[in-house]
């Protein structure tokens, strides 16, 4: 091969390399622009909620909206807390969330352990039927659950908010998949040493599956915090109102006029705990879900 051919070959390689660099750079720029646009679309409603909560009602109703309040009204937050009785709503929601989460964890752990380690007739068939129920929309159970709660006399009680949602097939499946990753040899060795199933579950499996359990706890608490339809149906009295239902009716006067800035302030207060939980514990959520999806 002549020197001229070598030079042309090097030039072609350089040209291809430059083109690849340009294409890769263009892809990166497009990717970052796309992510930036998506981030703005997602974050803008939260930004609008915050600035709206700092305005007065007259400025909020301006035909040309302002993107920052001319005068900051921090008093909206104090008014929101007292008007909506947020203290009681927080306590009610926390009580339902904590109790339902603890009971749900007990049921989920025992069920997942049974399907992952114990051997009994019809185990796979039963687990398959449970998974099949995940394809049924939860809304279909609303009427039957309501009738059952009414017949049991649980209307307007915390029991009606807790019991119907103690069992989650998705959480059982999630934890069972995590338990399946733990070598069965550990279980057999423990049985040889005379360890009971409950002791093995408590000493070995639960510590190893802790990230998934934390994920389930967070998701369950968030579900209780955001619940609206069911509490509205079965426990909408003042003594048992959840935080989402309390906000719905707290800021409308006798003329039907809603004080939107104060309502936005209340929504910001209610959203803050969930935002902080996700901000500081998101790694546990992702870790628990990813660990449960490795082995089927």
Regions of interest found by a model, annotated:
Residues 19-23, 27-296:
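A structural signal for multi-pass alpha-helical bundles of membrane permease subunits
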């Amino acid at each position: 091969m002549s020197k001229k051919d070598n030079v042309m070959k090097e030039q072609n390689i350089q040209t291809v390399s430059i083109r690849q660099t340009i294409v890769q750079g263009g892809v990166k720029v497009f990717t970052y622009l796309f992510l930036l646009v998506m981030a703005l679309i997602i974050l803008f409603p939260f930004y609008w909620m915050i600035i709206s909560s700092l305005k007065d009602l007259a400025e909020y109703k301006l035909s040309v909206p302002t993107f920052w309040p001319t005068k900051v009204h921090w008093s909206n937050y104090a008014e929101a807390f007292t008007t909506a009785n947020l203290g009681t709503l927080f306590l009610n929601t926390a009580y339902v969330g904590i109790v339902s989460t603890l009971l749900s964890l007990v049921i989920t752990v025992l069920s997942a352990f049974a399907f992952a380690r114990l051997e009994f007739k019809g185990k796979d068939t039963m687990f398959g039927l449970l998974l099949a129920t995940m394809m049924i929309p939860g809304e279909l159970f609303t009427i039957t659950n309501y009738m059952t709660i009414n017949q049991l006399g649980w209307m307007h009680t915390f029991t009606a908010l807790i019991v119907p949602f103690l069992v989650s097939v998705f959480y059982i499946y999630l934890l069972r998949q995590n338990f399946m990753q733990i070598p069965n040899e550990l279980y057999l060795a423990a049985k040889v040493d005379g360890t009971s199933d409950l002791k093995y579950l408590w000493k070995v499996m639960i510590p190893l599956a802790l990230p998934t359990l934390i994920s389930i706890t967070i998701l369950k608490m968030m579900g209780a915090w955001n619940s609206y339809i069911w509490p509205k149906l079965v426990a909408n009295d003042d003594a048992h109102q959840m935080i989402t239902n309390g906000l719905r009716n707290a800021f409308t006067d006798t003329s039907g006029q809603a004080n939107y800035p104060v309502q936005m302030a209340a929504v910001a207060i209610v959203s803050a705990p969930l935002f902080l939980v996700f901000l500081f514990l998101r790694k546990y959520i992702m870790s628990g879900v990813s660990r449960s999806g490795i082995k089927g």
